[in-house]
A protein has these predicted regions:
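Conserved acetyl-CoA-binding loop-helix of GNAT-fold acetyltransferases
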Residues: 76-89, 111-115
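Conserved acetyl-CoA-binding loop of GNAT-fold acetyltransferases
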Residues: 114-122
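Conserved GNAT acetyl-CoA-binding A-motif
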Residues: 90-102
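Conserved beta-strand-loop-alpha-helix junction that forms the acyl-donor binding cleft
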Residues: 100-109, 121, 125-132
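Short, P/G- and charge-enriched loop/turn segments at secondary-structure junctions
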Residues: 30-32, 138-146
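Acetyl-CoA-dependent GNAT
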Residues: 3, 7-74, 80-84, 150, ...
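Generic C-terminal helix-cap and adjacent flexible tail
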Residues: 159-165
Length: 165
């Protein structure tokens, strides 16, 4: 398996839309708003002609937010390759940090990002509860591993410190 990561092209959009729908992340609730993940730019991972991963991102002033990151097969390096691509992109855009929001039940994501240098930056207590009540009532009460889904966690990677450290 040879994974290639590249910026998505217009002709990739239909496949990205299907991929995000399959991972139930075409529209995501975070920080009190719904965001259509099909609209921002994306990095894609391909194995030959097969789409095996998508990372969508948004820039804010001097930071790059990882909006979504999903792969077809975990534990094969695809997510790491996409995240490394986003890090290179963020540096080329002169971003000082990368950040993302995940939920309190997503222990796999917490492990993944922390092992790649991200740290817990902020807790948004009750954010998922508020999103469920006001934005998307289909957000489940119970998430991964039977954990009650309540809070959003913000993780960040300071790019300046990485370059000097």
């Amino acid at each position: 398996m040879t994974i290639m990561v590249r910026e998505a092209l217009p002709e990739d959009q239909a496949a990205i839309d299907v991929f995000l729908e399959l991972h139930d992340t075409a529209v995501v609730a975070r920080l009190g708003e719904l965001v259509d993940a099909r609209l921002p730019p994306a990095l894609i991972a391909v194995d030959g002609e097969r789409l095996v991963g998508v990372l969508t991102w948004i820039t804010h002033a001097d930071s790059l937010e990882v909006l979504t990151l999903h792969v077809t097969d975990q534990w094969r390096g695809t997510g790491t390759a996409l995240l490394d691509g986003a890090r290179r992109l963020a540096k080329s855009l002169e971003c000082r940090r990368m950040w993302l929001i995940t939920t309190n039940d997503n222990t796999d994501a917490l492990r993944f990002y922390q092992r790649r240098g991200f740290r817990l930056a902020r807790l948004h207590p009750g954010a998922v509860d508020r999103s469920r009540a006001t934005l998307n009532p289909s957000i489940p009460d119970i998430g991964d591993h039977g954990i009650q889904l309540r809070d959003e966690l913000e993780l960040e990677l300071e790019l300046e410190l990485e370059a000097s450290g």
